[in-house]
Amino acid sequence: MSADGLVSAAASAEEQAFEAGLRPRTLTEFVGQRKVREQLSIMLEGAQARGRPPDHVLLSGPPGLGKTSLAMIIAEELAVPLRMTSGPAIERAGDLVAILTALSPGEVLFLDEIHRIARPAEELLYAAMEDFRVDVILGKGPGATAIPLDVAPFTLVGATTRSGLLTGPLRDRFGFTAHLDFYAPDELARVLTRSAGLLGVSLTEDGAAEVAGRSRGTPRIANRLLRRVRDYAEVRADGVVTRDVARAALRIYDVDGLGLDRLDRAVLEALVGRFGGGPVGLTTLAVSVGEEPETVEDVAEPFLLRAGLLIRTSRGRIATPAAFEHLGLEPVADPLGRSQAPLFSNTGLLAEGGLLPEDGLHPGGG
């Protein structure tokens, strides 16, 4: 399944419109991220007591965990307007000047994908965040003149899925930073129960648990699966989403008990069935499943790594014992006759998400 598939954390424009009706409006309604909610609540209450805008907020974490919802909640809790834009939409410094000078006092500016903002615009943002001022340059060369323009006090909420790409000067200007983590199954079940109530879906407790367990720790995926399961319940069942109904529905959509889709399983089956569990190079593995290496690396591998089904080593990709177990197979011995378990424990592993100079490491591999 492609990056925009059923268990992808990315959201289409149509889905974003649908999500608007499910978003929580207050920190109390927001499920999960307990520490982040508590920290935000204290900061917002303190700012309101002082009668000043709160510090600028940076929210990081994988897509689909609620960064946009929290930005909306911040504005709602402060009872101020919210203006939304994104890093890719700001191509020139002038684009940002137009936005900043139009802000009303206390307004919240939400800048999604802030790591993708153009460098000239980012540099202009520094003074706006610190001094509520922007310097507009008129002319070029030695005769250029800087005209300072005041900006109404505001709160910037930046969101990023790749905080490592933020420059130090930009990151340092945020007074509050928080990282959103993946959700536990019980938290996702609460998200699903709330969404089912808003959508008018009859969802049993075990049905919610079943969908939650296949949602990859991501509320956006959970809500997407709920919509598909609802369709199945209405068309082929009695309209009630039970555990059995959820299982039958998600079987049709090729989402298994761990939340793996067609591509995920194809990668695992190739790694285990064709290459004996590895190690095997990325290019060889991608060719074996008929996908581009970038697709395997960016779409399938992140969740397989997080689920403990695949690891990256200096010799290539290797299937873990859990991968064999998930496929209903026994771990095989490596060419030296050892079991897979010592191989995993003795291999020097890079941190999850690291890139390795491996390829052509399996016999016959590319």
Swiss-Prot record:
Among SMART domains, the record links this protein to:
AAA (SM00382)
Residue sites binding DNA per the record: R312, R317
Q: Which domain of life is it from?
A: Bacteria
Q: Where in the cell is it found?
A: Cytoplasm
Principal subcellular localization: cytoplasm
Q: Per the record, which residues fall in region Large ATPase domain (RuvB-L)?
A: 3-183
Which parts of this chain are annotated as the region Head domain (RuvB-H)? Answer: 257-366
Binding of ATP: at which residues? L22, R23, G64, K67, T68, S69, E130, D131, F132, R173, Y183, R220
Give the binding site residues for Mg(2+).
T68
What are its E.C. numbers? 3.6.4.-
Q: Which UniProt keywords apply?
A: ATP-binding, Cytoplasm, DNA damage, DNA recombination, DNA repair, DNA-binding, Hydrolase, Nucleotide-binding
Looking up Gene3D superfamilies in the UniProt record yields:
1.10.8.60, P-loop containing nucleotide triphosphate hydrolases, Winged helix-like DNA-binding domain superfamily/Winged helix DNA-binding domain
Listed under subunit, the entry gives: Homohexamer. Forms an RuvA(8)-RuvB(12)-Holliday junction (HJ) complex. HJ DNA is sandwiched between 2 RuvA tetramers; dsDNA enters through RuvA and exits via RuvB. An RuvB hexamer assembles on each DNA strand where it exits the tetramer. Each RuvB hexamer is contacted by two RuvA subunits (via domain III) on 2 adjacent RuvB subunits; this complex drives branch migration. In the full resolvosome a probable DNA-RuvA(4)-RuvB(12)-RuvC(2) complex forms which resolves the HJ.
Its name, as the record gives it, is Holliday junction branch migration complex subunit RuvB
Q: Origin organism of this chain?
A: Frankia alni (strain DSM 45986 / CECT 9034 / ACN14a)
